[in-house]
Amino acid sequence: MPTRSLPTFLTLLLLASIDWVSKLVVLLKSCQLSPHSSAFLYSYVWGHFSFLIIPSFNEGAAFGLFAQYKIPLLIFRVCVILGLALFLRIKYKSLHRRTRIALTLILAGALGNVGDILLHGKVVDFLFLSYYSWRFPSFNLADAFISIGTLLLIGHLYFTKESKKCF
């Protein structure tokens, strides 16, 4: 591995590890709850906004989609990870720094969720946001990495003059 791509690789491993450790902590803490305690591990309420840590499981893709296609979904996810990793490796020098950061975030999130599927057979979600009666589906840090990476990539592609140099 060239030394130029080493920071990207280490960042990828660090982010995936942070995701896995956060899920492990939530699962271990939820095992310590007594049957008579509330289902959430943490709550913060500010006016009509609330943030909760509630362990839940997702057997499908985003928002539980395609849960009935576990094996094809896993194969698709692994192919996406391998494709992204290969693309990042081959094009590393020619990619704009923002593109590398975005792809690293997406790849770290994908690795985090695939690690869950291989370990638990489903993805561990635990972050829950609500505002008034609006409730966002629960998610995890890997999902946040994927979302932030995607937004960075879209922002770079559409809103910068250098977007033609992106790939």
UniProtKB/Swiss-Prot annotation:
Keywords: Aspartyl protease, Cell inner membrane, Cell membrane, Hydrolase, Membrane, Protease, Transmembrane, Transmembrane helix. The keyword Hydrolase applies. The active site is at residues 125, 143. One of its GO terms (cellular component) is plasma membrane. GO terms for biological process: proteolysis. It catalyses: Release of signal peptides from bacterial membrane prolipoproteins. Hydrolyzes -Xaa-Yaa-Zaa-|-(S,diacylglyceryl)Cys-, in which Xaa is hydrophobic (preferably Leu), and Yaa (Ala or Ser) and Zaa (Gly or Ala) have small, neutral side chains. InterPro entries: Peptidase_A8. It is found in: Cell inner membrane. Pathway: Protein modification; lipoprotein biosynthesis (signal peptide cleavage). The chain crosses the membrane at residues 8-28, 46-66, 68-88, 101-121, 139-159. It is a multi-pass membrane protein. GO terms for molecular function: aspartic-type endopeptidase activity. The keyword Hydrolase applies. This protein specifically catalyzes the removal of signal peptides from prolipoproteins. This is Lipoprotein signal peptidase.
